[in-house]
């Protein structure tokens, strides 16, 4: 049985395909608006207690996180439906998730509602949104096997996000200037603008993606069934969570996971309190928050091009280490600025911070691009282990972990700030010195410590361009009917090192997908 999805695997991707793929991360301006302004919107114009807001958001994200693995599971198995075989498994998932995301994104910003309303809407929103980012995360692996094309897709993804972030920051600065930032109306109007634009970009991007065709390796449902004719609801439920946990048996994924979590955590902490840091520590205005962020996004587009070139020359892990060391140096500088800004004119503080945060984009871009580049190779290890292409599985896990990290960070930030006496709705100059110091140490210290952790973990990661070529070659040999008995000694060693299990247990001779498989 065939499908109408546009296959790209096995040939070079055109730049038209790569640029239309950029529309998907460009649509993430909707999410950037939530991450940057939602907490401020709830605690400042709506004057809801920060303790209530952080608890509400944490619960919403946590419950949504339990739903997230289902999206990766569905996306991988969309070819088992007539709709999926007609439009494609990734494209079909996006076309289902996009309208749901629009509806609940709009409902997030409705003012004057009771707390239970915001809790419910946040739960549903954080349960729906992963249907989009699980697909976007999976596409570099889905669209091509070529390492250079994957590096370029990762770069295009980052540039798309950078363009969206810059446009949001500049546009927000302009709109806050003419509408003000003291009432709920400006936030609501801005959010509605991004709701429409983001959804249009998302749908157009979805219609243009390329993906793997329906064949033996993308027919995941056959592995789910095993010797059974049909998998029931309870069996599906068990399968979702078994697939979520069983990937930890794969050594490369475990190593990648530590690297991902370290950088994701420090970026989330910084993102959560970025506006508070600039407003309450540096005593700048909301417009200056957007402008500072905007400059970093603009410079980020240049940085992505630089890192895309460096990654192909240095490899993912060495590029990650370089970006991390650069980030550490810059945040030491930001820490010093936070301690000494009181003796500087406001214009000087704004200029110095803008320079430092813009330069941070160079380090952050290296970290994110290297991590995303390496992540695109993890499903190739999984294929050698399971005999199936499960890009959505790993994208779903990553989305779930993103929700979990956001949840934990949201709880901790709220608890810490409330414990030290943070005042919701207060003037920027009326926060206590303790609150200011806590924000300073959280903002800078978290980045420095976790960046060092990430550097140490990269030395445990053995998936590189050389071992990846060996891995992909072996998968292609087995896929084309080759015997596992004919494996070379070099290939066996590479496979066992990356998989973390004996070679004979690979290529589906395990229960990584199906817990009932006795092989």
How would you describe each model-predicted region?
Residues 2-518:
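Membrane-embedded alpha-helical bundles of multi-pass transporters/translocases
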């Amino acid at each position: 049985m065939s499908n109408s999805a546009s296959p790209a695997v096995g040939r070079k991707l055109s730049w038209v395909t790569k640029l239309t793929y950029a529309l998907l991360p460009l649509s993430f301006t909707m999410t950037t608006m939530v991450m940057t302004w939602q907490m401020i919107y709830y605690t400042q114009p709506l004057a809801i207690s920060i303790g209530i807001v952080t608890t509400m958001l944490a619960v919403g994200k946590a419950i949504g996180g339990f739903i997230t693995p289902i999206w990766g599971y569905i996306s991988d198995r969309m070819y088992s439906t007539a709709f999926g075989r007609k439009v494609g498994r990734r494209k079909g998932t996006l076309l289902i998730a996009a309208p749901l995301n629009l509806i609940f994104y709009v409902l997030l910003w409705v003012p004057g509602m009771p707390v239970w309303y915001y809790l419910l809407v946040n739960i549903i929103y954080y349960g729906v949104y992963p249907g989009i980012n699980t697909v976007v995360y999976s596409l570099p692996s889905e669209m091509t096997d070529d390492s250079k094309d994957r590096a370029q897709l990762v770069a295009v993804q980052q540039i798309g996000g950078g363009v969206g972030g810059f446009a949001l920051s500049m546009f927000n600065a302009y709109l806050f200037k003419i509408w003000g930032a003291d009432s709920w109306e400006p936030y609501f109007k801005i959010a509605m603008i991004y709701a429409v634009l983001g959804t249009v970009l998302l749908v157009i991007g979805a219609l243009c993606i390329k993906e793997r065709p329906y064949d033996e390796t993308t027919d995941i449902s056959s592995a789910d069934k095993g010797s059974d004719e049909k998998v029931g609801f309870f069996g599906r439920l068990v399968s979702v969570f078994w697939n979520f946990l069983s990937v930890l048996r794969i050594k490369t994924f475990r190593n990648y996971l530590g690297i991902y979590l370290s950088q994701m955590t420090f970026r989330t902490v910084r993102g959560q309190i970025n506006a508070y840091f600039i407003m309450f520590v540096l005593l700048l205005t909301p417009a200056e928050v957007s402008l500072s962020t905007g400059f970093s996004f603009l410079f980020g587009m240049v940085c992505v091009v630089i890192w895309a070139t460096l990654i192909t020359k240095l490899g993912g892990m060495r590029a990650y280490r370089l970006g991390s060391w650069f980030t550490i140096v810059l945040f030491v500088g930001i820490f010093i600025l936070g301690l000494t800004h009181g003796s500087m004119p406001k214009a000087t503080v704004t200029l110095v911070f803008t320079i430092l945060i813009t330069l941070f984009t160079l380090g952050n871009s290296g970290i994110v691009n290297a991590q995303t580049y390496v992540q695109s190779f993890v499903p190739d290890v999984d294929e050698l282990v399971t005999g199936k292409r499960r890009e959505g599985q790993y994208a779903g896990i990553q989305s779930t972990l993103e929700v979990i990290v956001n949840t934990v960070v949201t709880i901790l930030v709220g608890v810490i700030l409330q414990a030290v006496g943070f005042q919701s709705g207060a003037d920027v100059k009326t926060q206590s010195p303790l609150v200011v110091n806590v924000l300073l140490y959280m903002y800078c210290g978290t980045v420095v410590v976790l960046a060092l952790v990430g550097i140490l973990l990269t030395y445990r990661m053995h998936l590189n361009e050389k071992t990846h070529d060996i891995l992909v070659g072996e998968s292609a040999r087995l896929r084309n009917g080759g015997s596992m008995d004919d494996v070379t000694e070099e290939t066996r060693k590479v496979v066992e090192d990356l998989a973390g299990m004996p070679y004979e247990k690979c290529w589906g001779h395990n229960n990584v997908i199906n817990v009932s498989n006795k092989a």
